[in-house]
Amino acid sequence: MNKRDAINHIRQFGGRLDRFRKSVGGSGDGGRNAPKRAKSSPKPVNRKTNVFNEQVRYAFHGALQDLKSKPFATFLTVMVIAISLTLPSVCYMVYKNVNQAATQYYPSPQITVYLQKTLDDDAAAGVVAQLQAEQGVEKVNYLSREDALGEFRNWSGFGGALDMLEENPLPAVAVVIPKLDFQGTESLNTLRDRITQINGIDEVRMDDSWFARLAALTGLVGRVSAMIGVLMVAAVFLVIGNSVRLSIFARRDSINVQKLIGATDGFILRPFLYGGALLGFSGALLSLILSEILVLRLSSAVAEVAQVFGTKFDINGLSFDECLLLLLVCSMIGWVAAWLATVQHLRHFTPE
């Protein structure tokens, strides 16, 4: 930096410093020519608050000016952040809607219990009572041998063949519906093992094949969403950190002047922190807009597919709480990335 550039930077910073002093302490002459006022008790707390507010305003204004000075580069950075955040947001919405569809359209898993044919009605009622008393059982639907035969006759259409039989070949059936807390794979297996030990039970079958497939599918979608989210958060962190680093190098002459006249690291650091937070917030806001556009475009297609299957399903986007959380998290990521990039530069910076 030559002598003329240094003088220009000092003049610019001196003008900003004068405006800062005027806004905080009144006129620029330190109050020497101001009319005398009645003495009053000092208010150091209010003065400190005014100084802090003015520093925040100055730093925020500097961050905005820095972003506005290079609009194309800022736009590209925000677009990269938005696209990086849109992918995990869409994956999360897919995971959330798959869970909603599973809850809405799939029944709870059931355990079918076949009783021994030698049991009479009283013994069968005792077995059903034991099933109902088991931990984790919500409800037991009992079907006697006669009811099972009548239902099979109506369903199969082999009424004539069944009439030729001398005795009823079907056993009594008890359908056990577990509680919501016992609908996991391990809990169902434990409940099935306990039911098998009850006297009077011939066979136990667990109708959870579809449930296991659905749980595996939703778990896979959730893990993929989490992995993509972690990678995209790292990408956003690197993008914001690199953008702030380039901004620091572009303003190294101004930082040099500020260091020479005694500016603290916190004063130099604050505009870059606000700039990183603004980049994260803007990218997250644009990501929410892109995600909502994608939901609106896919809603009609999903509705048509659901209509073909004779049902109705609506895609749910991100809720207000989820949108607010995304904005806050991305702003914090931008803040931390800018802090790391700026601190690393100031640590090795030597005024010239």
Swiss-Prot record:
Pfam families: FtsX (PF02687), FtsX_ECD (PF18075)
GO terms, biological process: cell division; division septum assembly; FtsZ-dependent cytokinesis; peptidoglycan turnover; positive regulation of cell division
GO-annotated cellular components: ATPase complex; cell division site; division septum; divisome complex; Gram-negative-bacterium-type cell wall; membrane; plasma membrane; plasma membrane protein complex
TM regions (residue ranges): 75-95, 224-244, 276-296, 323-343
Periplasmic side: 96-223, 297-322
Topology, Cytoplasmic side: 1-74, 245-275, 344-352
NCBIfam families: FtsX_Gneg
The protein's name: Cell division protein FtsX
